[in-house]
Amino acid sequence: MNLHEYQAKQLFAEFGLPVPEGFACDTAQEAFEAAGRISTAKKVVKCQVHAGGRGKAGGVELHDTKEGVKEFAQKWLGKNLVTYQTDANGQPVTKILVEEASNIANELYLGAVVDRATRKIVFMASTEGGVDIEKIAEETPELIHQSAIDPLVGPQAYQGRELAFKLGLVGDQIKQFVKIFMGLGQMFSQYDLALLEINPLVITGEGNLLCLDGKINIDSNAMYRQPKLREMHDPSQEDEREAHAAQWELNYVALDGNVGCMVNGAGLAMGTMDIVNLHGGKPANFLDVGGGATKERVAEAFKIILSDDNVKAVLVNIFGGIVRCDMIAEGIIGAVKEVGVTVPVVVRLEGTNADLGREVLANSDVDIIAAVSLTDAAQKVVAAAEAK
């Protein structure tokens, strides 16, 4: 689960990190009033969306007057912001962050991720702040400095000092950086984060450090024990189909093809998408129904897939392990009838009672195309999609 910038900064402040004074606003009038409460002559106004590249897309501006701030809010609230990280529709803007402008002398980068290979939290710091860190990692990896935190021990001050020295910080800046490092390390573990970034972490004209932007991603598997963070969830930033899938514990990712895919198991789902591509088709989605391919879950999966108008055919690829293929076949038939599927449906069953499952499909009164192999299924669904 992602957080907005203003939410990330709220957490930063909770752990004693320096952040600009700012207010998240729902209306243009609130933005106008917030601008009046900020002491600096210039105010920064930012659209709050779960995407980068806001500045280049016009979603971040600097204003001298309260009226300018209000006009910005009127322009964007209720609209969609399209950036290089969004699709063509963009992300809806429901909040505007109004905050004090900062006197920036230099920009740094500070971030942290979980390194699954070492089972540690790895902090990354660079003097190249304010730019795409992936580009820096590819072109000049020597400019990125790392420090690994053992989650059983927690962040240590000496690790923060080492990074501060590598960043060229001096004097009181080192103490400030260590405080930021320690706070982020504690936050990462306490809130079950998967990723955090401060980009940029700026050095102000007065020589102080300031968290100018913030990005936080929380491990969705840990949300059950993070009630505070659950309340920060903004469903408006999610694809409607993906949100629907999450309610049914279905793993769904929308793509831009015309062949809907319903599979049990992430690995099999990826293999299915590959073979559809191999035979000239384009998958419309990744959808893993998991181990419990019940009639109800299959029906919801069909609803999600068919809510995409680009879908011209659906491939159901199920491997029956614990769940028998004949039971899965009955569930598919019931789901097709319930949903009223109008596009061709190709079904490939393999595993426990696969022959019986195919017999159930063949004897049903619904129009389902049975496949005897994965290659056969891919060829049939691609042909069906092209014929529509």
Swiss-Prot record:
Binding site for ATP: K46, G53, R54, G55, E99, S102, E107
Top-level EC class as recorded in UniProt: ligase
Cofactor(s) annotated in UniProt: Mg(2+)
Keyword Metal-binding: yes
The EC number(s) this enzyme carries: 6.2.1.5
Pathways per UniProt: Carbohydrate metabolism; tricarboxylic acid cycle; succinate from succinyl-CoA (ligase route): step 1/1
Cellular component, GO annotation: cytosol; succinate-CoA ligase complex
Residues annotated for Mg(2+) binding in this entry: N199, D213
UniProt cross-references to InterPro entries, sorted A to Z: ATP-grasp (IPR011761), ATP-grasp_succ-CoA_synth-type (IPR013650), ATP_grasp_subdomain_1 (IPR013815), Succ-CoA_synthase_bsu_CS (IPR017866), SUCC_ACL_C (IPR005811), Succ_CoA_ligase-like_bsu (IPR005809), Succinyl-CoA_synth-like (IPR016102)
Catalytic activity, as annotated: succinate + ATP + CoA = succinyl-CoA + ADP + phosphate; GTP + succinate + CoA = succinyl-CoA + GDP + phosphate
GO BP: any one term: succinyl-CoA metabolic process
Keywords recorded for this protein, A-Z: ATP-binding, Ligase, Magnesium, Metal-binding, Nucleotide-binding, Tricarboxylic acid cycle
Entry keyword annotation includes Oxidoreductase: no
Cross-referenced SUPFAM superfamilies: Glutathione synthetase ATP-binding domain-like, Succinyl-CoA synthetase domains
Cofactor binding remark: Binds 1 Mg(2+) ion per subunit.
Pfam family, one: Ligase_CoA
Signal sequence annotation: none
Cited Gene3D superfamilies: ATP-grasp fold, A domain (3.30.1490.20), ATP-grasp fold, B domain (3.30.470.20), Succinyl-CoA synthetase domains (3.40.50.261)
GO MF annotations in UniProt: ATP binding; magnesium ion binding; succinate-CoA ligase (ADP-forming) activity; succinate-CoA ligase (GDP-forming) activity
Role: Succinyl-CoA synthetase functions in the citric acid cycle (TCA), coupling the hydrolysis of succinyl-CoA to the synthesis of either ATP or GTP and thus represents the only step of substrate-level phosphorylation in the TCA. The beta subunit provides nucleotide specificity of the enzyme and binds the substrate succinate, while the binding sites for coenzyme A and phosphate are found in the alpha subunit.
Family, as annotated: Belongs to the succinate/malate CoA ligase beta subunit family.
Record's subunit section: Heterotetramer of two alpha and two beta subunits.
Protein name, entry field: Succinate--CoA ligase [ADP-forming] subunit beta
Originating gene: sucC
